Each structure stands twice: as structure tokens, then as C-alpha cells.
Amino acid sequence: MTSIDMKEDSIPAPRSGEEKSGRLLDVKDLHVEFHTRDGVVKAVNGVNYSVDAGETLAVLGESGSGKSVTAQAIMGILDMPPGKIPQGEILFRGQDMLKMSNEERRKVRGRKIAMIFQDALSSLNPVLSVGYQLGEMFRVHEGMGRKEAKAKAIELMDRVRIPAARERVNDYPHQFSGGMRQRIMIAMALALEPDLIIADEPTTALDVTVQAQVMDLLAELQREYNMGLILITHDLGVVADVADKIAVMYAGRIVETAPVHELYKRPAHPYTRGLLDSIPRLDQKGHELYAIKGLPPNLLKIPGGCAFNPRCPKAQDVCRTEVPALVPVTEQDGAQLPGRGSACHFWKETIHG
């Protein structure tokens, strides 16, 4: 494959909802490893997913599943070394970002793809005002002067509904609540009107009411700008009203894909079933809360066969010897279920049983 000759304006820069359309991102057979003194950590093992303009993909899984590492690989912010991407493609609007130079990648990051990190307090510089940090996006990428950039920062703070934005633009991160800091992170991601936003656990450590407000704000802004959104989370409750489709990850692999409401109604993988069963329900007061037994595997020593087999109630001998491929899921009569896939030898028993 020939290398791509990237020029500064080689990736289109749509700025209106009408122009932002079609396939934005294709991740193909992505592998990420970390080389440590104890051995090679296989954090991501052949991940495939895509995101279109205006679409929300939720990437779901426990800690250590590889969901955040995949996002960091897309953004180009993995520490390499010790990280390494031995194979795979990350296509943004058809062009492989893994073949770009650092300078070419920098022009995509922020302007075309932006990321919202889970811990706003540690992501923001504590000794710089939030207005300065928001304005920096415009000074660096748009060449604006400080006064004009500050005006843009106030406009963004208003847009994400931070009260008294003009008075608070000179405040520092510690002077804002957790929910307001997360709004600042959203404003920073939106600054250059990117095509795609990656939100990594954006509601972690926020109370339930603030979580809902932040997710509603993200959904509203996504519709307004027709952006693609990748929502990384371990919380099924967060994605139900926001996502269009879900990719469930376990031990570096995608084990199930489905449109969001289909997955909630009929999971096709025992791991997904376990996650759903562990959600507290108001109609089951007094019942013992289900928990998936055991712990996620050590990525230095991933079990043979299906990585979930030591914890799976349906595991049989084949599960311990053969890695299940992600295959299309169908109805009992063979009718196709669009967007559905499962990496389980016994997906039929799981979804139809």
C-alpha cells in the first residue's frame, strides 16, 4: 500500500451540518500492544468499528477492556514506546491516520477529531484561567489575537450553558463544580467544530442529575453540528437514550455489536447478558443484585479460546480452545438482523434460548 501524501488541506473541513455527512471513521483490525518488563500486554486485539456523521457509537466494557486505549490510538496520543500498533488501519474520511506524520496528525487532532476526557480537573491546567485555555484553541489553530480568542471563549461558555460566562471567563478550574468543569471540556472539544468527538467516560464522578444534564447537552450539540460521537463508558444506563449502536468490548476484543435498543432487548453474548442483569431495577426491590463472577483477565496472560470463558455460565470445551469470530446474528429462521454481531460459539442459545 502506498503512503498517503497528506497536505494541510487534504482532509475536507466541513463547517455546516449540510456538508458533514457520510462515513467519518473506520477502524479496521486494530491491534495495540504495550511492551513491559513482564511481557507484552495485548490491550487491543483486532477491533473493527465505524462511525457516520450524526451517529453515536457507544463502546462499552469493564476497566481493562481496551475501549480507552482504542480511543487514544485514534487520537494519536498513545505513549510509543511502550505502546505499539503492530497492525490495523484508522481511516478518517478514507485516509489512514496511522500513515500520517506527527505534523499531519496534529492538524487533524482538535480541528477534525476532538476528545473529552473523564477527569476534567486533571485535564485542565490549574494555573491558567478557563478562558485562556479555551482561547488557546483559536490562537493556535486559527491564528486569532488574544482579545478575539477571549470573546470566542465567552461565546463557547454561553453555548454549553455556564452561567455568567463573561464574569467567569477569568476563573480557574478549581473554582468550578465538577459538572461545570465537564461543560468546559465539552466547550473545548467543540471549539473548532470537529466532525467527530470521542467522549471517554464523560460523566464519571458526577451525580446522577448532573450526568443526565451533561449527556443531554452532548446529544443536543451533536444534533446541532451533525457530528459523529464515540461514547466510551462502562455504564449501560448512560447510553440507553443517547447511542444509536453499541460495541461491547472484553479483553481487547469486540464481543457484540447491535443497535442500542436491540441489545437491551435481546443480548447475543453472555458477557452482555451479565452486564444487563447487573443493572439495579426498581421493579426488583429486595432481590439480590446479580454480579458477573470472577475478574477481567490479566492481559499478559489472556485465557485460551474465548477470553470470557472462565467467567461464563455457558462455557463448554470449545470455548476454552477456539477463539470465536464476530459473526452476524440472525433470527431463528435465518433472517438478517442489521448491525448485529456476536463473538460467541453459543450466541443462538443466548439470544433465542
Segment roles from a protein language model:
Residues 18-23, 163-167, 257-353:
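Short catalytic/signature loops enriched in Gly
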Residues 89, 93-96, 148-167, 276:
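Conserved ABC ATPase "signature" region
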